[in-house]
Amino acid sequence: LTGSAEAKEGQITGGYVHDVEAGLHPWIAVLDFKSMYPSIMIGNNVCYTTRIDPSHPEQPGQDDATHVSPTEAAFWTTEHRKGLVPSLLEDLMNQRDEHKAQIKQARKDEQVEKEEFHDSMQYAVKIMMNSFYGVFASGFYRFTHKDLGSSITAWARQNIKTIIQKLEDEGHHVVYSDTDSIFVCSPVPEGSP
């Protein structure tokens, strides 16, 4: 063992991993959340340019809307100031959606090369979008702060745990979850093929 699994000083808490229920589970549905971290960054306007520094003279007033993460870090809403990174991510998400639409059209038209091209492009955009979280969670990047990465993962943990709780409250058994995916027993009648 290298000790890499041990918590390092200053390291942020990652995504939520639900304990695995060992065994063979028939009829499992996988709920995977589209671009969870980028969506959180867009929806909560998470950016170095929107983080509200408690020591800074510009503080939100009573009537100012802010996004407050589960870690209690605060970010200006887009009404006050739209973040640079959320703006870039919105554009990238739109590009990825367009490539995915082109994949469907290429399949329909039986254009294999076009399908492969757009699949490669959407995958490259996906990696680029997810790299923004990696930058925010890194201590090496110049325009970051621990509040950024820790807020993103805290909102993700909160979201996934809330959804798991709602599923279980409705009688759907969750057998596993990891970061942005939930594996749940599908409500298929006993004895179904």
Segments predicted by a language model, with ranges:
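Conserved acidic
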Residues: 1-193
